[in-house]
């Protein structure tokens, strides 16, 4: 006699296939998926529980899927081919490095199980001023830069960035923004981040428009 699968089993299989497609597409569009963010948690858990299947989807394309357990709780889609990585504009890179630095500083003072790292626009502007940049980032420019970082699941604004006390949630994925990060040594990574920021410093009066050039 031929063995027939139950409708319930068929629905479960279809749901699994759909989740694989949904998660794979999400990684392609956003590079990271986070277990600590409520609307991404199901996708992160799917990658965690079906890592081999997810990797099998991307392997023929030359991508690797890396899983970072707690405390990071992140899955990353990585392509090592030259020219295939996401390219950030100069001020996007600067903002990313500033948020990375602030994340490292804040994380040291938070409880190990803290889910959120929040920084204020004032803290961001203070770090930017140290770099002698040619202009202060206004609200519109900052919000435009944040759209890119949000797309790649690096950070997101908490509401409108309308004042110095407005907040930005910084995701642990900023730690993975620099290659070969030593995730166990926050002090070393802070120093490294400041070194990277130093490459963008400009003397007073330099004429550079925000957002020009690539990182």
Question: What does each model-found stretch correspond to?
Answer:
Residues 206-215:
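Long, low-complexity, intrinsically disordered segments
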């Amino acid at each position: 006699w031929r063995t027939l699968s139950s409708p319930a089993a068929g629905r479960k299989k279809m749901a699994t296939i759909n989740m694989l497609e949904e998660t794979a597409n999400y990684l392609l569009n956003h590079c990271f998926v986070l277990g600590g963010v409520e609307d991404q948690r199901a996708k992160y858990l799917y990658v965690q529980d079906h890592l081999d299947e997810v990797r099998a989807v991307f392997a023929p394309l030359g991508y690797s899927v890396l899983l970072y357990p707690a405390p990071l709780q992140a899955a990353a889609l990585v392509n090592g081919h030259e020219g295939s990585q996401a390219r950030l504009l100069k001020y996007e890179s600067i903002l990313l490095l500033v948020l990375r630095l602030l994340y490292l500083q804040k994380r040291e003072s938070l409880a190990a199980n803290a889910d959120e790292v929040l920084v204020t626009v004032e803290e961001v502007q203070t770090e930017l001023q140290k770099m002698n940049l040619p202009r202060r980032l206004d609200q519109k420019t900052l919000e435009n830069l944040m759209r890119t970082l949000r797309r790649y699941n690096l950070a997101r604004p908490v509401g409108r960035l309308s004042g110095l006390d407005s907040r930005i949630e910084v995701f642990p994925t900023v730690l993975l923004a620099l290659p070969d990060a030593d995730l166990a040594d926050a002090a070393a990574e802070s120093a490294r981040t400041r070194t990277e920021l130093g490459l963008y410093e400009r003397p007073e009066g330099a004429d550079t428009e925000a957002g020009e050039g690539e990182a």
